[in-house]
Structure formats: C-alpha cells, structure tokens
Curated annotation (Swiss-Prot):
GO terms for cellular component: core mediator complex; mediator complex; membrane; nucleoplasm; nucleus. The keyword RNA-binding does not apply. Component of the Mediator complex, a coactivator involved in the regulated transcription of nearly all RNA polymerase II-dependent genes. Mediator functions as a bridge to convey information from gene-specific regulatory proteins to the basal RNA polymerase II transcription machinery. Mediator is recruited to promoters by direct interactions with regulatory proteins and serves as a scaffold for the assembly of a functional preinitiation complex with RNA polymerase II and the general transcription factors. This is Mediator of RNA polymerase II transcription subunit 16. Residues 866-877 have a biased composition (Basic and acidic residues). The lineage of its organism: Eukaryota, Metazoa, Chordata, Craniata, Vertebrata.
Length: 877
C-alpha cells in the first residue's frame, strides 16, 4: 500500500498563474455540468463551460486559449444540446473533437488557420446515447524516448520510431483518419474521414449482452487493434475489456469486437473494505498506446482508493495426461492473459480528477530503473486532484507521492482586505478537470468555480539535482520538441535567466552533431527555439533580434531563389539558385558587375509586375545590409542588435547573393531597386555596399575563427553615415506574452477577456526597447508594408512573437502569393513547428500560430458563465 497523505519531501509544484471570470455579487455556485478539458501539443487548451441567458436558455460553450495569452479567450457556441462530456485534440493540435450526452460528435477545425476562428463541418451521431469515451484513431506513429542515451550524438538514437500499426490504413499504407467513441448503452461507434471529405460511420455493440457503461477508456495496440475498457460504475461489477478491429469492406466501415480478460478491483475482494468504496469513479489506461496497464479509482462520498493493474502473459499448467497425449503441448507451455495488480494506495480523500502524462516514457522495469539511475523524472508521474483542493503527483506504477500542491497557495490580490477574504468553512474549491502538458512540465486544472489554474511541475520533482544534470534534462526535452515539432512553452516555464546561455550553446552543439540533411530540416526550428530562450535573460535579449532577423533572411532568400527559372527545360543537375550560390562563393571580386556577368542573366527574367510587387522585400534586404555595414565600427558592443551577423559568413554570403539578384532585377525594372537617401546624386549605392559587404564576407567566410576586418574597411564603414541615410530597423514586433514575465513563487492573477498590465523584468524592459511602442504606426512584419496607427484592414497576430500581418492579401501576383502562402499556417517564431517528418515521419498540417485582430475579429468576448443560479448584472433589466 502507498500512503498519499504524507507529502513528499521537497516536492516541487507551484502555481504559475490563474485566470478567472469577471466577478459579480452572489456568484459562488458551481457550474451545473461536469467539465471537460484537453491540452494540445500546440499548447492550446480547450475546456467547457455553460452560459445561461435571460430566458434561462443554456448554451454549451467550448473555450479555447493559448497558454501564453490565457486572458485572450475564444468562446465557441458549440450547438451541442446536451452537456459536453468529452474533448479530444488530434496529433497535430489543429483539430478538436467534442461529444455530448445526446450522442452527437463534432469535429472542429481552424478556419484560415487561426487559433480564434473555428468551424465544424463534419461529425457523427448516435442519437440519444451519451458518449462516455472518445479518441482519434491512431496514425501509427509512436516515438520512444531513450533517457539512457541522452548523451548520444544522434537524435535518432535518443528518439526512435517504434513499430506501431495504424488503426486503419488507406492504399499504400497511409493511415486513415477518424475517431472512435463508446456510448453509455455499450455501443462502439467509428467514423472514418475519407480523402474526399465523406464520413463513413458504423456502430456495433461491444458484446452480445449490452449493459450500462458509466466509464470507459480507449487505447491502441501495436498490431493496429483498439482496446476498450468499460465499467458500469459499481465496484462490485467487473471492469470489462474488449478488442475492437476496424476495417473497410465494400466502401463501408466494419467493426469486429472480441471480449478480453476482465478484472475486479482488489478493494472489493477485501472483506474489510467490500462495501467501503461502492463506486468506480475513474478508469484510465496509463497511455493511449499502452493497453496493458490501467488505472482504477473507487470512491465513496468522502474517500477514494486508487489501484494500478497490468495485463501479463502467464503460463497455464497442463495435466500430465495431456502432456503424454500431445508432446507438442509439453514442449511449449500454453499461456493466458491475466490482469495482475501492481500497486494500490491507502484510503485517500475523495479524488475529483485524474491527469495522465503524454511523454512516451517506457514503463518496463528496466526502463524505469534507467530513469531512476539517470534521475529523469518528467513523464513518470500522474496527477490526482482531491476534493480538499490539493493535487498530488504520484508515480505511474508504484503510486508513491512525488510532489504535492495545496490550493491554499493560490494568489490573492494585494489590495484585498483580510476581512473581505472568504472563509474556509464549507466544501473546498477543487479541480474538476485536469490535463498535463505534452512534456509533463505543466498542469492545467479547471475548478468548481470555472477558474483556470496552470501549475509548474519541476523536472526534478523535488529531488536534489546537480545544475549540469538539470540543464541536461531540459536540453533533452527541448531536443524532443525540436524533433517532434511540439511547442516548447511549458519547458520555458522552468528556464532561469542564468540557464539561457548554457542551454543555447548546448542546443547548438547538439544540432551541429546531426547529419547535414537533418540540420537542413531543423535549421529554422532551432533558430526559433534559440530566440524564445534568449527572451528570458537580459544578457541575451539582443540575440532575439538576430535570430528573428535570420529567420526572415532565410525565408526571403529561399523565396527569391525559387523564382529563378532555367532557360532551357533540359536543365543540368543544379538549379539556378544553386548555381548562383556556387558562383558567388567562387568569385570573390568586390565589383558587383563582374560577379553578375558570370551568371546566366536569362534565368533571372521575371514579369515586370512581379518585380515591382517584390520591392518591399528587396528594400528590407538593402536596408539591412546598410545597417550592418554602418554598425561594423561598433562591433565591440555585444548588446547591439545585428552583432552576430558581422561574424556569420553564411548569412553574409546569403546577403551578397541577394544583392547580385537585386542588381540584375534592377536592370529589368529600376523601380524595384531599394531606395537609398544619398548625399551625392552620382553615387552608386548598390556597388558601394556590395564592395564593403564582400570585404566583410571574406574575413569570415571560411570555417574556423573569423579574422578581424582591416582598418581600411572599418574606416570606409565609418564614412557610410555621411554618404547614406542609415535606416532605423524594426527589430522585434511588440509581444505581450507571459512566459518572459513570470517569476518563481510569484503567481499571476488574470481575468478572462481583460489584457493585464504584466510586471516587467530586466529582460522584458530590454525587449520593449527593441520593439515599436504601442502608439506608433503599425507595420505588416511579413509583407513589410506600413499599416498606419489604426489599420482599417483585418489583421492577424502571432501568439508567440507578436508579428502582425494582414489577413487578406492585397497582392495578386503569383510570386508574392507564394511568399504569403509561407505564412498562412505559422509565423517566424514558430516556423517549422508542427508534427514533421524528420523522426516522427508525420506529414500532418502544421498548427497555426495566429489569432485574428481588427474590427471584424471573430473573437468572442468572454462573459461570466451563466450556469449559475443568480443573474449576471448585464442580464438584469
């Protein structure tokens, strides 16, 4: 037995922030329906809450928020007529399933890839039959984390693919999308999404004798089968397990079921406890792709007990008579599957919610010993919430306490008088729904008053760790997010300013140890990750500008090179872009015209309208080159934005190539050239900048330490401000995110629908100094267009870096549309995020990073939940 009443020594779990609904008098009653909550790999949280109107009509709402901006809530009228019982994100984090107590299932997807614009176009219905369990079909992708190989050089050794079959495959082995649900009457329903958009739905009984299903959960096997666990709610009844096989026969969905071994909770077989816990209140598989281990919780009105069970293959004794009749049987002992209890707790306070980790840590004894030896604790614990308001993190198998959080630590406004604080008499406010983040470093809970709380879960779980080991664990999880494409916001919660420099250096070191092909796949993602890390320390804030600018430069370079077309169809093995790079690398002449004559200029011919439409991007390249060269005399200042480019031969070479391309296009369309304000009318600004840029590039183009630029080059750069007007660059968009402003042990209290005045830090003050002030005219950061102080066009903003861009394109040329297509799903700060194909071999669409702004925003202003007994002030006549 495990005693959860004893807090773990040094357990580390603290509150990051809480977000509440607007307050009004007499609003202390709980929402009248059970809550559902889901956390996606994009760090989007969805949860349910009802609204009651003046005439007592109830609207079932689904609320979606980004953990970085929790106050910016988007509320969806779900059109569910009964209580929503289940919410489930897909693997890409861009689609959401909702199911209700009337058997209706809706599939929500993002409209225009906006995190605050959702639509439901497909769904299914089992009329009048409440849904008790819901899951997307497995896509066959399973990743294993090898903690013991965290020091290996290859990401392929640290994170390997596990052989796992999809629930259903299309022609060629592509996984078929769809969902499976279990109803309260014992039916299993499967809906398949065909590539044509058609939905195939089939419903079958789990067994011949249908019975009431109060609780159910769904898991998947490596062979492509589905396992469903059910309970009728009584601890005196067995927990049943079924194997479900899905197939498509003659364009129709077919479901086959088979009964598997069942179990009785051990607390019911103990004569002293037989009637103490009459109801099974929670039934969960320990992981979606681990059908051999299950967690059960039985409860009374005041207490609970938790048991962990494992399905094992055991030998079946055979009588000697049968061994003599059949020697083959004697050689190989037959086996059966049998449920065995792994661990159980002592009597606990009543459990109100359970949350399971999503980190794919193996739970075999060998792997658990390795995790213990390496002191890697993320993913080993599950969360239990109790009616007394506390939350316990317990080991997934042994159920030993790892960390404890008490709700008494919840923050209160500083100006709230003590006499006005509510008394503790009566039932404690407790979490009714919980979810762990995808790295198990954060937990979200919705309490009985509708308040949302986000907790940090320390990677050490209170165990004393060396600083180097703690950094290694965070680095390992950052690499995991880099490989999978998952958002790493929850990891940033645990990065202290003193860790940033080491983490960035070690992350770059691990990146350079990968193969060239993998480095190319991850090149933009690691820059975005470095930028988010550098925001957390005042010593590295200016690097954020450099990483952000490099992402933009890479995007411009790849887009402009892709516009080049070979003159003949039977092209050699190299593209025009590759030949441009090769020639510019080989020819080190400082005269731009001499470099240009070595190129096949016919490959650079574009339509005149296209060239003119690209002028804003070409202007940015020209301005950036001028700024870099003018800042060369101040290269000793590490705090100056752009400093890292002065020693980056790759980026300088990229700029040099673009200057050549711009020069050629300027001969075709002079009005597309960058505009410089020069003191002399006869000065060739492009030639001057190319000459200085080439000299600087020669100093650092080779691998190894860069040589110092000669004094003549520095002197020429000193003269630039007297020859050309140096532009002021917009280094960073304004961002009002939380993660860089959170302080340890100082939780924030926020309110839905009201942007807070967040406390500043040394890092955020520097960040604000590098961004445009709120009152200044806005700029479209991706199109480089000025929008004015109050834009009239609909805009969207990145939820991570704050980049603003117009929602609808003002351009019609194909080339510019190609540039804009790059930013439909994501922004600079999240470019490359989303499930990808480097290790996980997923080709799912990337999750968006934008929310809509402007006068026609689809954002619904959140209001206080109306599932309360008293009228809201706005509802009173």
């Amino acid at each position: 037995m495990c005693d959860l009443r004893r807090p773990a020594a040094g357990g580390m779990m603290d509150l990051a922030y809480v977000c509440e609904w607007e307050k009004w008098s007499k609003s202390t009653h709980c929402p009248s329906v059970p809550l559902a909550c889901a956390w996606s790999c994009r760090n989007l949280i969805a949860f349910t809450m009802d609204l009651r109107s003046d005439d007592q009509d109830l609207t079932r709402m689904i609320h979606i928020l980004d953990t970085e901006h929790p106050w910016d809530l988007h509320s969806i009228p779900s059109e569910h007529h009964e209580a929503i019982t289940c919410l489930e994100w897909d693997q890409s984090g861009s689609r959401l399933l909702s199911a209700d107590a009337d058997g209706q299932i809706k599939c929500w997807s993002m409209a225009d890839h906006l995190a605050n614009s959702w639509e439901s176009s497909v769904g299914s219905l089992v009329e009048g039959d409440p849904i008790v369990a819901l899951s997307w079909l497995h896509n066959g992708v399973k990743l294993a984390l090898h903690v013991e190989k965290s020091g290996a050089s290859s990401f392929g050794e640290k994170f390997s693919r596990v052989k796992f079959s999809p629930s259903l495959t299309l022609f060629g082995g592509k996984p078929m999308e769809g969902w499976i649900a279990v109803t309260v009457s014992g039916l299993v329903t499967v809906s398949l999404l065909k590539p044509s958009g058609q939905v195939l739905t089939s419903t079958e009984s789990l067994c011949r004798l249908r019975g009431r299903v109060a609780l159910a959960d769904i898991a998947f096997t490596g062979g492509g089968n589905i396992v469903v666990a059910t309970a009728d709610g009584s601890s005196a009844s067995p927990v049943q397990f079924y194997k479900v096989c899905v197939s498509v026969v003659s364009e129709k969905c077919r479901i086959d079921t088979e009964i598997l071994p069942s179990l009785f909770m051990r607390c019911t077989t103990d004569l002293n406890r037989k009637d103490k816990f009459p109801a099974i209140t929670h039934l969960k598989f320990l992981a979606r792709d681990m059908s051999e281990q299950v967690l059960l919780c039985a409860s009374s009105q005041t207490s609970s007990i938790v048991e962990c069970w494992s399905l094992r293959k055991e030998g079946l004794p055979v009588n000697n008579i049968f061994q003599q009749i059949s020697p083959v049987v004697g050689d190989k002992q037959p086996t059966i599957l049998k449920w065995r209890i792994l661990s159980a707790t002592n009597d606990l306070d009543r459990v109100s919610a359970v949350a399971l980790p999503k980190l794919p840590i193996s739970l075999t004894n060998t792997d658990l010993k390795v995790a213990s030896d390496t002191q890697f604790y993320p993913g080993l614990g599950l969360a239990l919430a109790f009616h007394d308001g506390s939350v316990h993190i317990v080991h997934r198998l042994s159920l030993q306490t790892m960390a404890v959080f008490y709700s008494s630590a919840a923050p209160r406004p500083v100006d709230e008088p003590a006499m006005k604080r509510p008394r503790t008499a009566g039932p404690a406010v407790h979490l009714k729904a919980m979810q762990l983040s995808w790295t198990s470093l954060a937990l979200v809970g919705i309490d009985s008053h509708g308040k949302l709380s986000v907790l940090r879960l320390s990677p050490s779980m209170g165990h004393p760790l060396e600083v180097g080991l703690a950094l290694r664990h965070l680095l390992f999880l950052l690499e995991y997010c880099m490989v999978t494409g998952y958002d790493w916001w929850d990891i940033l919660l645990h990065v202290q300013p003193s860790m940033v420099q080491s983490l960035v250096e070690k992350l770059h070191e691990e990146y350079t140890r990968q193969t060239a092909a993998l480095q190319q796949v991850l090149s933009t993602r690691i820059l975005a990750m470095k930028a988010s890390l550098c925001k957390l320390s005042p010593c590295t804030v200016t690097r954020v500008c450099d990483y952000h600018t490099k992402l933009f430069l890479i995007a411009i370079s790849s887009t402009l090179k892709s516009l080049l077309r070979p003159h003949f169809l039977n092209t050699p093995d190299k593209s025009p872009g590759d030949r441009l790079t090769e020639i510019c690398t080989k020819i080190t002449d400082v005269d731009i015209d001499k470099v240009m004559i070595n190129l096949k200029t016919e490959e650079f011919v574009l339509d005149m309208n296209t060239l003119q439409a690209l002028q804003q991007l070409l202007q940015w390249v020209g301005d950036f080159v001028l700024y870099l060269l003018a800042s060369l005399p101040n290269q000793g200042s590490l705090l100056r934005p752009g400093h890292s480019f002065l020693r980056d031969g790759t980026s300088l070479g990229m700029l040099r190539e673009l200057m050549v391309v711009i020069r050629i296009w300027g001969l075709l369309k002079p009005s597309c050239l960058p505009v410089y304000t020069a003191t002399s009318d006869t000065q060739d600004s492009m030639s001057l900048l190319f000459r200085l840029l080439t000299k600087l590039w020669i100093c650092c183009r080779d691998e190894g330490p860069a040589s110092e630029p000669d004094e003549a080059l520095v002197d020429e750069c000193c003269l630039l401000p007297s020859q050309l007007l140096i532009p002021s660059l917009d280094w960073l968009p304004a961002s009002d995110g939380l993660v860089s402003r959170l302080q340890p042990k100082q939780p924030l209290r926020l309110q839905f629908g009201r942007a807070p005045t967040l406390p500043g830090s040394a890092a955020t003050l520097q960040l604000d100094g590098l961004a445009r002030a709120p009152g200044q005219p806005k700029i479209d950061h991706l199109r480089r267009l000025h929008l004015g102080a109050c834009p009239t066009e609909e805009c969207k903003a990145c939820t991570r870096c704050g980049c603003v861009t117009m929602l609808k394109s003002p351009n019609r040329t194909t080339a510019v549309k190609q540039w804009e297509q790059r930013w439909i799903k994501n922004c600079l700060a999240v470019e490359g995020r989303g499930p990808d194909a480097c290790v996980t071999s997923r080709a799912s669409e990337e999750a968006p990073a934008f929310v809509q702004l402007g006068p026609q925003s689809t954002h619904h202003s959140p209001r206080t939940p109306r599932s309360l007994d008293h009228l809201h002030p706005e509802d009173r006549p």
